[in-house]
């Protein structure tokens, strides 16, 4: 699931701060009228609105009063997209790093390519000579795996709906403990064994303890954003390596296709579990748990719903009649005034931080399944580098298209369908067409 966090409106109301101009330039007529009484201000705003509608012209002073001097709405939208491009690039880096960690481990550590067991969620074996039986077993494994994922997602949404925050935090903490301590211990032991590096157990345990303790603090409490992002990338890579090792080959490809379809349904359907989770978080003005989401930037809590200021002690921007005609977004839904946290110190007239730090949020599940696809391409079959690089490029192309759609629709979108579809197409076409062609050229010593 991919979400773009940006305020619905960057315009400010006409007050002492936003209408400050140099003493040499005269104050615009609309700003002077804006300082009149409430009734006069409403009548003036209505008269100006009707006049603009009849003449079909825009008053440039209006943008000065709204905190956007001489900037038309089209330019504002253009600047918004340019500003978000930085965070789009910032999202490519962690996805690339996660896939690089997985591919490097698959190519060097033999432990994750040895098939000596299966997950409990995939009980049907694929060690059968019959193609039909193997395909049937892979479909049955996929049905069981997707059913478990759906059940766990619905269970999480129900817990969040009924505010069982302590249970959810305990659940996430136990998962993080297992990944940061147990899986890290196994991973580090296999890496040291592969590269023939000797290390005594006290040093190994101390290293794992320091790594896991710092990760728990950064993810579930406080820590530098870069360090938190690094731990989330490492957690995703460790989970992807577990799936690569214990998922049967055919079942893995069928599961990747099925999980992309489920992601599409869960995010876009009105009663989809992931969509309900995001909408509930927006209604309550609460951030989604950081252990489930990767954020490309630090995002401060800004109200996204119409809340009662007296109930939470928040400061709401005053109502401006001039913004009545702009109070609906492109989809016909009302854009409510944003609610900001009051300052810790100072007076009511002190400046507030009204600019929200924008960022793109990507679920850790997307990191995991991207890495599973690339890791399986590197581990199964021929393990050709052309196939691995083709899957890598396909995932980035799909992610880029998803981010483009995100900038257009400005709502939560599934991040798996396009990338996984491109990845599967590139994998099978490269493995069955490009690789044999390259092998034939190499055998005849022909170079293009």
From Swiss-Prot:
Residues in the Lumenal compartment per record: 109-138, 188-200, 245-249, 383-388
Recorded superkingdom: Eukaryota
Record bears the keyword Glycoprotein: no
Keywords on record: Endoplasmic reticulum, Golgi apparatus, Hydrolase, Membrane, Notch signaling pathway, Phosphoprotein, Protease, Transmembrane, Transmembrane helix
Keyword Protein transport: no
One Gene Ontology term of the molecular function aspect: aspartic endopeptidase activity, intramembrane cleaving
PTM remark: Phosphorylated on serine residues.
Segments dipping into the membrane without crossing: 414-434
Signal peptide coordinates: none
Recorded domain comment: The PAL motif is required for normal active site conformation.
Subunit-structure text: Interacts with DOCK3. Homodimer. Component of the gamma-secretase complex, a complex composed of a presenilin homodimer (PSEN1 or PSEN2), nicastrin (NCSTN), APH1 (APH1A or APH1B) and PEN2. Such minimal complex is sufficient for secretase activity, although other components may exist. Interacts with HERPUD1, FLNA, FLNB and PARL.
Descriptive protein name: Presenilin-2
Species this chain originates from: Pongo abelii (Sumatran orangutan)
Gene (name only): PSEN2
């Amino acid at each position: 699931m991919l979400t773009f966090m940006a305020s619905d409106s960057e315009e400010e109301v006409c007050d002492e701060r936003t209408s400050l101009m140099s003493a040499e330039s005269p104050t615009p007529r609309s700003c002077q009228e804006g300082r009149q009484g409430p009734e006069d201000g409403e009548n003036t705003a209505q008269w100006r609105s009707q006049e603009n509608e009849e003449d079909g012209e825009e008053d440039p002073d209006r943008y000065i009063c709204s905190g956007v001097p001489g900037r038309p709405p089209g330019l504002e939208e253009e600047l918004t997209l340019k500003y978000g491009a930085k965070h789009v690039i910032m999202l490519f880096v962690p996805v690339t790093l996660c896939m690089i960690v997985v591919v490097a481990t698959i190519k060097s550590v033999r432990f994750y390519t040895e098939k000596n067991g299966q997950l409990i969620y995939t009980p049907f074996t694929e060690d059968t000579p019959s193609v039909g039986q193997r395909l049937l077993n892979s479909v049955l494994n996929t049905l069981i795996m997707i059913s478990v994922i759906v059940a766990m997602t619905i269970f999480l949404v129900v817990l969040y709906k009924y505010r069982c925050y302590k249970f959810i935090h305990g659940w996430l903490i136990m998962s993080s403990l297992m990944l940061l301590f147990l899986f890290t211990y196994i991973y580090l032991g296999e890496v040291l064994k592969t590269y023939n590096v000797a290390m005594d157990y006290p040093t190994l345990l101390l290293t794992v303890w320091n790594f896991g303790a710092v990760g728990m603090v950064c993810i579930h409490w406080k820590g530098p954003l870069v360090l938190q992002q690094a731990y989330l990338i490492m957690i995703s890579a460790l989970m992807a390596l577990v799936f690569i090792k214990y998922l049967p080959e055919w079942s893995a490809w069928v599961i990747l296709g099925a999980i992309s379809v489920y992601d599409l349904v869960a995010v876009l359907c009105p009663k989809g579990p992931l969509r309900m989770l995001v909408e509930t978080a927006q209604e309550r003005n609460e951030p989604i748990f950081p252990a489930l989401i990767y954020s490309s930037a630090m995002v401060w809590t800004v109200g996204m719903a119409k809340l009662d200021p007296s109930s939470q002690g928040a400061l709401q921007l005053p109502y401006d009649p001039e913004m009545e005609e702009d109070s609906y977004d492109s989809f016909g839904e009302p854009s409510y005034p944003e609610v900001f946290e009051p300052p810790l110190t100072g007076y009511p007239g002190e400046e507030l931080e009204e600019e929200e730090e924008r960022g793109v949020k990507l679920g850790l599940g997307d990191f995991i399944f991207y890495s599973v696809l690339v890791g399986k391409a590197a581990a199964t079959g021929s393990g050709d580098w052309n196939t691995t690089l083709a899957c890598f490029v396909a995932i980035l192309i799909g992610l880029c298209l998803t981010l483009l759609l995100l900038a257009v629709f400005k709502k939560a979108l599934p991040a798996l369908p396009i990338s996984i579809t491109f990845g599967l197409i590139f994998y099978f076409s490269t493995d069955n067409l490009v690789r044999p062609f390259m092998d034939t050229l190499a055998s005849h010593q022909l170079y293009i």
